[in-house]
From Swiss-Prot:
Assembly mode: Monomer. Binds 30S ribosomal subunits, but not 50S ribosomal subunits or 70S ribosomes.
GO cellular component, one term: cytosol
Protein name per Swiss-Prot or TrEMBL: Ribosome-binding factor A
Molecular function per GO: ribosomal small subunit binding
Ranges in coiled-coil conformation: none
Organism for this UniProt entry: Rhizorhabdus wittichii (strain DSM 6014 / CCUG 31198 / JCM 15750 / NBRC 105917 / EY 4224 / RW1)
Keyword terms of this UniProt record: Cytoplasm, Ribosome biogenesis
Main location: cytoplasm
Source species, domain of life: Bacteria
UniProt-listed Pfam families: RBFA (PF02033)
GO biological process, any: maturation of SSU-rRNA
Matches recorded under SUPFAM superfamilies: Ribosome-binding factor A, RbfA
Compartment(s) of residence: Cytoplasm
Family: Belongs to the RbfA family.
Top-level taxonomy: Bacteria, Pseudomonadati, Pseudomonadota, Alphaproteobacteria, Sphingomonadales
Length: 132
């Protein structure tokens, strides 16, 4: 493992720039700087940003809060991608402006599915037997 890599294999620089992009996007969306009716009426959480190794592409994972419709929010974000890219480029100092790709964050759904499975009485019983 290289000195500047995390155990997952991503460099610290990629993680740092990804966090800067995430904070910039969160700030833009929270302040309502995007003039879009859908984005104005939905609270959107930017959960993660994964940068490509050359920092030219950013995959942005978002989750609408309060049960908002993911498809409508993703479509609105994709419609406003050019504005968001220019704002992020202005706030995050990198050589190139990253192209943003918006995807729905499925990790919360996967986590709740695993939680439901672990609460299933038959599985809980098996887990208790294994612990003994």
């Amino acid at each position: 493992m290289r000195r500047n890599e995390t155990p997952e294999g991503r460099s610290v620089r990629l993680l740092r720039v990804g966090e800067q992009v995430r904070h910039a996007l969160s700030d833009i969306l929270m302040r309502g700087e995007v003039h879009d009716d859908v984005l104005a009426s939905h609270m959107v959480s930017v959960t993660e940003v994964r940068m490509s190794p050359d920092l030219r592409h950013a995959t942005v994972f978002v989750k609408p809060l309060l049960g908002g419709d993911e498809d409508i929010v993703i479509k609105a974000l994709r419609t406003n991608t050019a504005f968001l890219q220019s704002e992020v480029a202005r706030r995050v100092n990198t050589k190139y402006a990253a192209k943003l790709k918006f995807l729905a964050d499925e990790s919360f759904d996967e986590g709740s599915h695993i939680d439901r499975l672990l609460r299933d009485p038959s599985i809980a019983r098996d887990l208790d037997q294994d612990a003994d």
